[in-house]
A protein has these predicted regions:
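Structural preference for solvent-exposed beta-strand-turn elements
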Residues: 1-264
């Protein structure tokens, strides 16, 4: 593998992809980020058996190839590089990183042992990236931080046609936000539970794009997945198992008293 890529593009792509690298990986290869050079692009991928990240950026590829390197180490190196084009080249069991006068050598890990990333489910619709990030920020603060109650650390996503509702509660607080989105099927009706931390990270990281594509696995699928894609970045996550508490009934259908409060 041999290629040249813009320094800022590489640093941003590696930083985003390495977010999914676990701090304490159950197997050594999961500490790596997979790099694949093909055609005119560099594809970066990471996976921790729950959340996957896939990012494709433009690159001048001289020689196709695949290599696996430490994700956190590569991210640290990419941030420290000068503002010049970056050359990546596999040399035996090492990966040489050159940028201006800077030179680094990374040990190549066993790329053949790296697990295959989950397949992105069929697209269900799109939503404005900034609207999604704003709504997730307003709702996720009400999710529990207690990992012994995985249901309450998650955000309930309800889809009914062009309406998308996010809900979260920690038993003391409750937040709900309704959004309008563009479903691929206007008769779509489904629910999903996703960890608040994962949803928050995804929403924040995709705000540079106009629209975010949302995909949910069908009920007949072997595993329950949700996927998000925008601007050459794609991430999938396993959904939380279980039935979310029926918190909607806590909101009255009508009230006799209304008040408007300023936020400034």
């Amino acid at each position: 593998m041999k290629l040249r890529v813009d320094r800022d593009i590489l640093a941003e792509a590696v930083t985003w992809t390495a977010r999914s690298v676990p701090a304490r990986p159950p197997v050594p290869v999961l500490a790596g980020v997979r790099l694949e050079a093909k055609g005119s692009s560099l594809v970066l991928a990471s996976f921790d058996y729950e959340v996957s990240a896939h990012c494709e950026v433009a690159a001048d590829v001289e020689e196709d190839g695949v290599v696996l390197v430490s994700g956190r180490l590569l991210a640290d190196i990419a941030k420290a590089l000068p503002n010049k084009p970056v050359d990546l080249e596999v040399e035996g069991n090492k990966v040489a990183v050159s940028c201006g006068s800077a030179r680094f050598s990374l040990a190549a890990m066993a790329a053949d042992d790296y697990p295959a990333l989950p397949v992105m489910p069929a697209v269900d619709g799109t939503i404005d990236a900034h609207d999604l990030a704003r709504a997730v920020g307003q709702v996720s603060i009400a999710a529990s931080r207690d990992d012994t109650l995985p249901l309450l650390t998650s955000v309930q996503i309800e889809v009914e046609g062009s309406s998308l509702v996010l809900m979260a509660t920690d038993r003391y607080r409750l937040a709900m936000r309704e959004l309008t989105w563009s479903p691929s099927n206007t008769e779509l009706s489904t629910t999903a539970l996703l960890k608040a931390r994962t949803l928050s990270d995804v929403a924040k990281s995709l705000t540079s794009s106009g629209d975010v594509t949302v995909a949910l696995s069908s009920e007949s699928a072997a595993s329950s997945l949700i996927g998000f894609e925008a601007g050459g970045r794609r991430t999938t996550s396993l959904l939380t198992d279980g039935d979310y508490p029926p918190v909607r009934r806590l909101f009255p259908e009508s009230t006799s008293i209304h008040a408007t409060v300023g936020t400034d």
